[in-house]
Amino acid sequence: LGNQKRMNYALRPDMTQVEFIQEVTDGLMPPPPYFPINVKLNKEGGYADIDEVLNQGLRSLSPAEFEAAADEVSALVLDVRSPEEFAVGHVPNSIFIGLDGNFAPWVGELIVDVQQPILLVVSEGREEEAVTRLARVGFDRTLGFLKGGTEAWINAGMSTETVNSISAEQFEAEHSSNQDRIFDVRKQGEHRSEHLEGAHHTPLSALNDHLAEFPAVEPFYLHCAGGYRSMIASSMLKARGIHNMVDVQGGFTAISETKIPRTSYVCPSTL
């Protein structure tokens, strides 16, 4: 406790209550839209029975059934595989939020309506995990998953889309002529701590508020910290008709190993 009093920026003895509140809340994002809804459900009840949720969500759908279900109820196609798999090929207009990342927080942040019908593209063997993790944050209207995944989708003659994804080394080679078309989708604190010189800061959580800022024709580059959030951003932009993005694999972590100019590092705790 004594060490905390000496070192913790928010425990200075000369701080007023107003200053303390400012320190500990600076940079905090608003709570995800599902938070107040889940609070209400926790207080009043109303969660769907988990067995019913699983029975519905674990329906395996052929490509034709999957497409028909999506059209019938305007279901959101949610791809929960890896960023690399999504980049290689995905169902058009699907949104990527991978299970191997901050899945539940980003689902709650980006899918506003907990009553949104959802169809899953998921790796074999992880179907129940996906349905369960969605239900835990209030999204209990999963209607099923694509049987056989994208391979079955392609074999059925359905079209797929891809994301142009390049290595940090390739990005370094292209950087000098594209410095004004780089978009950093990390959080404010990450960006303020260190970023690429000249990069636009467009947090993933606020992406929909910045659609007009992305070039209409020329390629532009997206990066986050490690490649997870930038692929989410790519999927969201593609679903809104913007397809000229280039995703940087490995994000800022990989870019930091190149010679691309960056701002001086500032410890986040001092911001």
How would you describe each model-predicted region?
Residues 79:
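Phosphate-rich cofactor/ligand-interacting catalytic cores and adjacent structured alpha/beta frameworks
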Residues 2-46, 51-55, 72-74, 83-271:
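Rhodanese-like catalytic fold shared by cysteine-dependent sulfurtransferases
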Residues 43, 59-68:
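Long, low-complexity segments enriched in small/aliphatic residues
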